[in-house]
Amino acid sequence: MLNTLPDFHRSFAEQLKLKLQSDSRIHSLLAGGSFIHGGFDQYSDLDFVVVIDPLYYDEIMAQRMAFAGTLGHLLHAFTGEHVGEPRLLICLFGPQLLHVDLKFITLDMLTQRVEEPAVLFTRDNDALKRQLAKFSAHWPNMTPEWFESRAWIWLHYAVVKLGRGELFEALGMLSFFREQVLGPMLFRRANLPQRGVRRIEALGIDPDGLLTSTLATHDRHSVGIAIRRAADAYVNLRADALPDNIADDAARRAVLAMLDAYSHKG
């Protein structure tokens, strides 16, 4: 299973597996991310789920940084509260740089998940299989209504930042809009799981250049054009699966009218 990885990643994963197999507190080691989705290459991160014996869970959680430090030359690490997952430790190992995610759970916590993990080792295969069988993996694709209820609010934010002259803020929102709205909708159009803007270039799922049309420089006119093209791209993609909450499309008209007014300002 690990022999499909690039040499550097494989070496780290094999050492991690041996290290955890020798630690009786560890029940199982699972892998996810690109290991599951495919396309693993030299630029990929390693994503692991470390399943801990409940008797030692609090102990290991309290010492996660030190625990990670035993796995290699740990340069820096921080926990995943910013993505709503405090059990996650995001690590950078060196001297050859490698990003490794370690999620610490007990077997009972292995419930809701977005993917079926690869099992690198387990001390109780039957117990692990029973737990995995209780819940099916569910990829968190967003609904048409989810996009519609947010799209015009976020585009309005970009417009008012343009109006104030906060071009960096507007540029940041355009990037956010591509990642949260346009990218996922392009994946939807291609009948693929929604994954932000991940590997869109390699997948070739934006043949019309909808995303690149929304790129702008730090210039008021350029940002104004990019916001309008972002709105146009959204309407284009929205047509694939019309949401129930369009109503009379008043939000779209109001946002574009404000954009017209601010685009001619200054």
Would you name each region that the model predicts?
Residues 91-128:
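Acidic, glycine- and histidine-enriched catalytic cores of nucleic acid- and nucleotide-handling enzymes
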